[in-house]
Amino acid sequence: MAWPNKRNSELRERANKVIPGGMYGHQSTALLPDVYPQFFSRAHGTRLWDPDGNEYIDYMCAYGPNLLGYGHETVEAAAAAQQRLGDTLTGPPEIMVTLAEKFVSLVSHADWAMFCKNGTDATSMAMVTARAYLDRKKILVASKTYHGSAPWCTPRTAGIVAEDRAQIIYYEYNNPESLESAFRSAGDDVAGVFASAFRHEVFEDQWMPDPEFANLARKLCDNSGALLIVDDVRAGFRVARDCTWSKVGVKPDLSAWGKVIANGYPISALLGSERFREAARRVFVTGSFWFSAVPMAAAIATLDQIEKSGYLEQMEKTGRLLRDGLHQQAAAYGYSLRQTGPAQMPQIFFEDDPDYRLKYCWCEEALVRGVYLHPYHNMFICAALTEEDVRLTLEATGEAFAALKKRQPTLEPVEKVNMLLAQRK
């Protein structure tokens, strides 16, 4: 099937000359099928357009930040109004106070907020705040869990030395015995325990937090004086209008936020409860653009939509429609899918596909039919997605299943993925 990508190919060639690897970080397409565009030219609602003019129904939502739909009218109006007044100033804007008030009013465990730019900023702020509270060193982190790209947590080890992680102790997510063992290993020096909102790692099925595990984490932190830190950067406000762990009835001491809170404008946050306010005050954290006003205005408008609109119910509804439709399609072509996690944050794998050749081929065939899915990362549904969008998506994925069935006898293992997975073991 013809799929124009001349402009994207030219951009890749130019990028390779001036950007290491042609692109870096989580938005590099190096591990995706070759037809995937590296660059995009514009977006609106649920749609993306690449430089060659190809249009996609986007199920990655900028890897999470697009919650309400690209270019949401209310959010864009708030951002534009603030831009006319000023963005990055000599001091923070007055709306920073309004934003903090709004945020803590929505999150039940929170009494204060600090703002930054990216999820890594927020999780790293949480770590130093936890250490400052009782002057302890050890941080407990679930193994093979993504909390950002700082030296203490980046999944790639190039440029990282052992000292960067000397005070990190690992445990298995949702495993009470493993968590208790990690506490014992740390003795009386546990500063904090990081836990993802739910398990949402690449190349893995997703798991929601088990109530027994979540309550044990809370109990162990209470008994030891350690801080319980929920990383809600990816899942925040996509599962609940509160911290995601509110779904299991557990309140953390700190929570890290990002992605959706300004519907794509660059801002993240650390939220905390009253007892840890003084520790947060004592740490020195800052950045040249952390106090920019335009993202804060966008965040206020976004949080207002989160509080008052039916965005969450809309995402859940269309997510379930898509999930049910894909199950039916897969079965019709003799395939079985594992669809895990919340329907509005779907992770999809094929059964009996250990080297990912089926998933990669299916995603490639969907892409050239105008649907942007991801072969190994969890996906995201935004509130702008309609039932008609789902219908069009299923039309494309149905054709993709048919194409996969024809191509399956000649498919080869995805070598670049298998090499990466071998390194992760």
Regions found by a protein language model. Give the residues of each.
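Structural signature of PLP-dependent enzymes
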Residues: 302-327
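Glycine-rich loop-to-alpha-helix module at the N-terminal edge of alpha/beta enzyme cores
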Residues: 55-133
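PLP-dependent enzyme catalytic core of the Aspartate aminotransferase-like
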Residues: 307-309, 368-425
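Active-site core of PLP-dependent enzymes with the aminotransferase class I/II
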Residues: 198-224
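Active-site-adjacent loop/helix segments that line or gate small-molecule/cofactor pockets in enzymes
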Residues: 2-42
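Active-site PLP attachment segment
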Residues: 249-280, 291-298
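PLP-dependent aspartate aminotransferase-fold enzymes
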Residues: 98-195, 199, 212
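Conserved PLP-binding catalytic core of the aspartate aminotransferase-like
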Residues: 320-324, 330-364, 415-425
